[in-house]
Amino acid sequence: MPNTESELNEEFSNEFNIPPPTESSSKEGNRFLNDFRVEFEKRRIEARNRILESEGRALENKTHLNEEEIRTNERVKRFQRRVDEWTALEIERESQVQPPLWYQRDREEQNRTLNFLMSGMADLQRTINTMQGTMNTMQGTMNTMQENMINFTNKVNTLDMRSVRAENRDLRKGAYVISPVPFINGNNPDPDLPPITSVQDVDRLSRSQCSRYLQGYGVTFHVNETIGMKKKLASAVGLSAEYDREYPFSGFPN
């Protein structure tokens, strides 16, 4: 590999007057190659343009140009091999150079600090995952408690409905009017519904009003029922005395 300026000038001499590399380095070698390729391309384009301008000498000039291109390409390949050798040597030298001791110690300290931080981050992530798992468990417990509360409320509402219905049965034994029975959800009947205090009140209800009452008490019925709906509603609110059961209900008004 050339080392002196004269050797470099001799090896990289060219007809394009491109300055040879000033030193045996990949930087200078690549600089020379780029300049050489650019100038060669310019000359090639100019030559081809001249060929096109002179059709009579086209074939001869084209042959000459092709030969020149072949020779120049071979020189480019030779230059490239030399630059590749320089690059490989530089890489080899850099791999053999050991950094100063203080630099190695700094890098080791940086690596230890980075490992410590990464370990801390991993611990933090595990803690977060544990907390998330605990929160999920708590959420599941709260959901279960909420479901239990809803079930308990439904049971209380059902007991309340049954309790009032039982009181109404006792009232009917003495021929008293009954009290309003809350729906199965714990709410009182809608205010726009006529109150029920006797079987006569049930008999005066429309089909829509009777359906709303039965749905509120959770009583199933068929849409085509008439008198059967009224009897079910009377039983649902505690109108179950003998004279209530024998009451002759009429159909729904049209």
UniProtKB/Swiss-Prot annotation:
Pfam families: Mug135_C (PF08593). InterPro entries: Mug135-like_C (IPR013902). One of its GO terms (biological process) is meiotic cell cycle. Residues 1-30 are annotated as: Disordered. Residues 41-86 form a coiled coil. Keywords: Coiled coil, Meiosis. One of its GO terms (cellular component) is cytoplasm. Signal peptide: none annotated. Belongs to the UPF0612 family. This is Meiotic expression up-regulated protein 23. It comes from Schizosaccharomyces pombe (strain 972 / ATCC 24843). The gene is meu23.
